[in-house]
Amino acid sequence: MRLAGLLLLVMTAVVPAEALRLEKVNYGDFSHWITRHIKESSVLGGNTKTIYAIGPSYTVNGARAFKPSGGTPWATSNVYAKVSGVTKASGSVTPFDRGGGNKCAKMETIMEKVKVAGLLNMNVVVPGTIYFGQVFEPITSTKNPYAKMEMGIPYTKRPAALVYDYKVVIPAGNTRTKATGFGSPKTLQGRDDCEVYVMLQRRWEDAKGNIYAKRVGTGRERFSRSSNGWVTGHQLPIHYGDITGKSYYKPYMGLLDGSKAYYARNSKGKIVPVHEIGWDSADATPTHVLVMMSSGSGEAYVGTVGNTLYVDNIAFGF
């Protein structure tokens, strides 16, 4: 009986994805993409660069500020920038064919270079990233990158896991590059990781328009080595309440405030930091969900060039 009980415990400890009730994320199968053709400034060559956004299939021609449409929750690190009057497009997220026309999202850490004689000479490390939210274009500088995007969308459910397919490619070596757009790129010791997270928050706003949050649920994982091809139906468990005393807790799962705070639009229309001030009760109902998938896991403008994360079939599991 004790052996039978142990076997039952082992069998039920990890619930296979097919046993979960899956709610697909809008456009989380990455079958549809918005194609953006942006003509860069003549001082950069005047070429037309193509970048992509996740959403209904259509094409946008010209350097226009992009806003999500068609019910897509997704934003990406692909942006239209205009720095010192120079128009530039950056694309570190692209559609990728898994085979037979089955598209997925490919995120790659790249080095963007902007060089204009006597005016600009910028090198910027850009990890490929997709996330729930919106980026505010055009990007006009590399300062305070989190203030240029809104992280998270309204959401009140309590899923057990984020379910997705993935493939990871990590290049050989043990270094990262720091390139912020100011000064020469620097080589740092230690390799960057690819990362996926889902966080549930309960947010509120005070009379002055400040936004606060408590963490309701947390799922966060990093990938430090290449996978053996595609991993399908992978589950990232979401743990509820204060997890700091749990065996699976890692420092990078902690609260987001100060320099780590993300931003959101308050009721006055202003973009302000979301101050995550504590852990909520394990049975709390969230107001927002944050989902992010990236070829990097470090600070802004730091990464291992060539890190690549492929993802597909994103869903919440219940």
Annotate each predicted stretch with a short phrase.
Residues 170-174:
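Gram-negative outer-membrane beta-barrel proteins
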Residues 1-24:
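Bacterial Sec-dependent N-terminal signal peptides
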Residues 176-185:
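Short mixed-charge
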Residues 20-159, 163, 178, 189-242, ...:
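Aromatic (Trp/Tyr/Phe) and Gly/Pro-enriched flexible surface segments
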